[in-house]
């Protein structure tokens, strides 16, 4: 939990209707300009890409796509990217809620969770990069699920856990849930030029564990 909002910044959490909320999850917004706010994108002459990235969700209000909660003490919890939120059984889950639990295990270096369309719903798929020499045994999978269930809810527990050799990231170092989700659904990934290691996407393609009957 962050102890406080950015000093001098009009940071709030808004629900889907644009109402300010506290004690519940929503979109992180900033109602007024702030010193570190970018003023545009390179080669975006009419500003359309810039506006679409930050001002399309709530017209005129900065919203960069973080799923967050303002706590009763005035702190802030970030749950991950709002466009990567999982929705099994209609329950919205931030991916960071899962990562915090999984990466407590010494065997796990890092992880990425995505939602896979499944039987008129969405199932949670967790992909883990393990330390050298570690295998994803049934026992390790059960420990991962137990750790998640103990500290979150049964809805957070992944239906499938698979091991991957690498996890794709942007050039700035952020993992890319949306690109991985597109790959496991057989969709084209739009902007691989933004990835530092686009070859890592191949570890998620046509996985037999994720085959839809």
Predicted regions span which residues?
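Conserved ATP/PPi-binding loop(s) of AMP-dependent carboxylate-activating enzymes
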Residues: 4-8, 17-55, 93, 188-189, ...
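Acidic, glycine/GT-rich loop-and beta-edge segments that sit at the periphery of enzyme/chaperone cores
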Residues: 5-8, 204-213
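Conserved beta-strand and immediately adjacent loop positions that scaffold enzyme active sites
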Residues: 10-11, 27, 75, 172
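General small-molecule cofactor/ligand-binding pocket signal
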Residues: 12, 161-164
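Flexible glycine-/small-residue-rich
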Residues: 13-15, 30-32, 128-130
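Glycine-rich, charged/polar anion/phosphate-binding loops
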Residues: 14-17, 110-112
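AMP-binding/adenylate-forming catalytic core of the ANL superfamily
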Residues: 34, 39, 48-52, 60, ...
């Amino acid at each position: 939990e962050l102890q406080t909002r950015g000093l001098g910044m009009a940071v709030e959490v808004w629900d889907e209707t644009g109402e300010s909320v506290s004690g519940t999850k929503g979109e992180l917004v900033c109602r007024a300009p702030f010193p570190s706010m970018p003023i545009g994108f390179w080669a975006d002459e009419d500003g359309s890409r810039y506006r679409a990235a930050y001002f399309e969700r709530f017209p005129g209000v900065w919203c960069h796509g973080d799923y967050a909660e303002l706590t009763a003490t005035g702190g802030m919890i970030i749950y991950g990217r709002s466009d990567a939120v999982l929705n099994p059984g209609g329950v919205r889950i931030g991916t960071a809620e899962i990562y915090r639990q999984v990466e407590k295990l010494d065997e796990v270096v890092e992880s990425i969770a995505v939602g896979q369309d499944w039987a008129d719903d969405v199932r949670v798929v967790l992909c883990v990069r393990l330390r050298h020499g570690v295998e994803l045994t049934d026992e390790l999978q059960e420990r991962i699920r137990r750790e998640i269930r103990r500290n979150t809810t049964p809805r957070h527990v992944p239906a499938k856990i698979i091991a991957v050799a690498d996890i794709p990231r942007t050039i700035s170092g952020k993992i890319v849930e949306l690109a991985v989700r597109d790959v496991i659904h057989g969709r084209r990934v739009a902007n691989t030029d933004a990835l530092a290691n686009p070859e890592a996407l191949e570890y998620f393609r046509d996985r037999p564990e994720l085959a839809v009957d």
